[in-house]
């Protein structure tokens, strides 16, 4: 966190258990403490799993939080995405994030449409994992997401690109609906 703050970059902190694609093996109490320490060190926002005790603790503290849900196996249907979004929004986060796994490019486009349909009050972050989802990672901000996710180094999720690749190769900050078609 301190490294990104010293470089003038915004920072999002996430610490996940293995069942959610991470490597953290500690308790939810430990995770809540680490999240709080990250905020105190300068993290702008925390990304936690929907329904987790750590997410509930951070919301109770009125900490800046993104509530997220990942599906490492499949793409959710349109109605399922809407239902999950409604249930997540009720929790009162700063933003919600849904990231299913795409097996087709059409499914990646479905995620971009989901982002575009966001209510004004709670921003949506949405893209798809997997090789077929990579394009949605690049285009999600074009369709209204406040941020996208990239790695500093090796990918930590299927289809994830490095920050260097997003900025230099794909020039993600220059994309708009005219340049992305």
PLM segments and residue spans:
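N-terminal active-site wall of soluble small-molecule enzyme domains
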Residues: 1-41
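Active-site-adjacent beta->alpha loops and helix N-cap segments on the catalytic face
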Residues: 1-7, 49-63, 76-79, 103-117, ...
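Short beta-strand/loop segments at the ligand-binding rim of alpha/beta enzyme cores
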Residues: 6-22, 61-71, 120-126
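Glycine-enriched alpha-helix->loop->beta-strand junction motifs that scaffold or abut catalytic
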Residues: 8, 40-44, 59-67, 90-95, ...
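Catalytic beta/alpha-barrel core
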Residues: 14, 35-37, 41-55, 66-77, ...
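Short, acidic/polar
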Residues: 27-37, 76-87
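Short, hinge-like loop/turn segments at secondary-structure boundaries
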Residues: 28-32, 65, 84-85, 114-116, ...
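C-terminal alpha-helical cap/extension of soluble enzyme domains
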Residues: 106, 110-181
